[in-house]
Swiss-Prot record:
Entry binding sites for Mn(2+) 2: D94, N126, H175, H250
A single BP term in Gene Ontology: pollen tube growth
Family per similarity comment: Belongs to the PPP phosphatase family. PP-1 subfamily.
Record lineage: Eukaryota, Viridiplantae, Streptophyta, Embryophyta, Tracheophyta
Catalyzed reaction equations: O-phospho-L-seryl-[protein] + H2O = L-seryl-[protein] + phosphate; O-phospho-L-threonyl-[protein] + H2O = L-threonyl-[protein] + phosphate
Signal peptide: none
InterPro entries: Calcineurin-like_PHP_ApaH (IPR004843), Metallo-depent_PP-like (IPR029052), PP1_catalytic_subunit (IPR050341), Ser/Thr-sp_prot-phosphatase (IPR006186), STPPase_N (IPR031675)
Residues the record lists as binding Mn(2+) 1: D66, H68, D94
Active site annotation, chain numbering: H127 (proton donor)
Protein name: Serine/threonine-protein phosphatase PP1 isozyme 9
EC numbers for this chain: 3.1.3.16
Cofactor: Mn(2+)
Length: 318
């Protein structure tokens, strides 16, 4: 495990990078230097490896699902939930691809991670994988705005991201879902980093699997990779591991959040009007100190609107 923090960026430099990135409202492109982005990747990589693969976090915390390069929507989420370090954040992965500003999105999140390493936490999504983001937009954005070398630096950083988080020993968070190989949380802690994402097995499933409304047990996924799992699988896993809730991203849901398995699993998706193709809302999940969950809904932004957010009543203890 790498714990050395040599060569970390100075706080003043980080604050300047964050300030410049936050000026990119209204669709304005923010062009950091290649040297600055390399430093962000290298420093963040050190921090990821110094923290566990199964993060152990505490409420209160705000949880965000997929962002997919929709930088303006990320800024809207921070406007509502509070900019770090005023609130604790956990992001469930899929920062890049499909949206227009993957670079701004991942650079702001990495900069915040380095600046406030105990206030903001980033999990790995299935798009934080060279095989996937080579195809779905991030590679092309890096190549167009910088070069392929920089994309490879990001790949080295992504290979060190943690894959799951446990909030107050009761809420388990990951990007995708459960795995037929997963019996206890110790197995997640044992996954070695840095690592690529394999085509099958525990790590693959944690980032790729989906809940299945129609079938019980385990079923092959229509995605052509990993599997789906029924409500019975969720109940069995939570009961055996003394957990209350699974929180995951990975799927577009119309209202930004969607419950499954008698509210024992929730899907969070934080990219409204995803890719300009879906009329979905985005959501931000707030977990208070009593583990009471509430949702803030981010409606697709009309061109003239600045912050169309709606608060949903509290949902009771998870």
């Amino acid at each position: 495990m790498m714990t050395s923090m040599e060569g970390m960026m100075e706080m003043g430099v980080l604050d300047d990078i964050i300030r410049r990135l936050l000026e990119g409202k209204g669709g304005k492109q923010v062009q950091l230097s290649e040297v600055e982005i390399r430093q962000l990747c290298v420093n963040a990589r050190q921090i990821f490896l110094s923290q566990p693969n199964l993060l152990e976090l505490h409420a209160p915390i705000r949880i965000c699902g997929d962002i997919h390069g929709q930088y303006q929507d990320l800024l809207r989420l921070f406007e509502y939930g509070g900019y770090p370090p005023s609130a604790n954040y956990l992001f469930l992965g899929d920062y890049v691809d499909r949206g227009k500003q993957s670079l701004e999105t991942i650079c702001l999140l990495l900069a915040y991670k380095i600046r406030y390493p105990s206030k903001i936490f980033l999990l790995r999504g299935n798009h934080e994988d060279a095989k996937i983001n080579r195809i779905y937009g991030f590679y092309d954005e890096c190549k167009r705005r910088f070069n392929v070398r920089l994309w490879k630096i990001f790949t080295d950083c992504f290979n060190c991201l943690p894959v799951a988080a446990l909030i107050d020993e009761k809420i388990l968070c990951m990007h995708g879902g459960l795995s037929p190989e997963l019996e206890n949380l110790g197995q997640i802690r044992e996954i070695q980093r840095p690592t690529e994402i394999p085509d099958n097995g525990l790590l693959c499933d944690l980032l790729w699997s989906d809940p299945d409304q129609k079938n019980e047990g385990w079923t092959d996924s229509d995605r052509g990779i990993s599997c789906t799992f029924g409500a019975d699988v969720v109940a069995d896993f939570l009961d055996k591991n003394d957990l209350d809730l699974i929180c995951r991203g990975h799927q577009v849901v119309e209202d930004g959040y969607e419950f499954f398995a008698k509210r024992r699993l929730v899907t969070i998706f934080s990219a409204p009007n995803y890719g300009g193709e879906f009329d979905n809302a985005g959501a931000l999940l707030s977990v208070d100190q009593s583990l009471v969950c509430s949702f803030e809904i981010l409606k697709p932004a009309p061109a003239s609107s600045t912050n169309p957010l709606k608060k949903v009543p509290k949902m009771g203890k998870s």
